[in-house]
Amino acid sequence: MSSSSIPVLPLRDIVVFPGMVAPLFVGRKQSVNALNHSMNLDKKIFLLAQKNSETDNPNKSDLYECGTVAKVLQLLKLPDGTIKVLVEGTSRAQLMTLNTSNDFLSAKIKIVDTKFKNNNNLKALVKVVLEQFEDYAKVNKKIPSEVITNLSSMTDAYKIADVVSINLTINMQQKQEILGMFNLEERLNKIHLYLVSEIDSFQMEKKIKGRVKRQMEKTQKEQNQSPPETNPPRIFLEVHQQLNRTANHSLHF
């Protein structure tokens, strides 16, 4: 389904998913104009991540083709001319054409179909992803407990996939890869692989920290049990000998 033209907000170093609420700071003139235009219409804006965050005036080749249509929830104009905006992603969409001729970017987009076609394979995959995410939340303490609670009451596989993706501690490119997967089964499989990898990484980190802690405790215990030295440490003897040699040499002058 194609939509009419919609203002575009290029994003630096962040990917916004459907269902995600995100605060954004906007300072570029084009982006400020896009937000103002959005507020004058239906408060809808198309969020597209940039391939390179250092690009100031992106064109179509500088932006990823898959983004998220979002609704502006709050907008606050700051004294320095920048804008703090709170947005909520509503739907996944594909960039069709980009208009750069105005004082803000606008686009023709195609909303991605999210009708859940239920089958046994998808149901099993969703169950595996949910179980893996629960394990992930046990090792990653940054996951709020209410996320698990909310997931347990969800039945929409698309929403489940997006909520899990939002809470994965993977890089921007990896999140963009997931956002751009229109096939739900492929997306869930990719999420599952990232979950397994992240859990392994956290467990390995925990093992290393535990090993280092035990070694430090062992060293400290050995130091506490060692009898006090009655003779000067070897390093002091070596320094003393060096000083004596220096003194003997000085007698010849």
Locations of regions flagged by a protein language model:
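N-terminal low-complexity, acidic/polar interaction/targeting segments
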Residues: 1-253
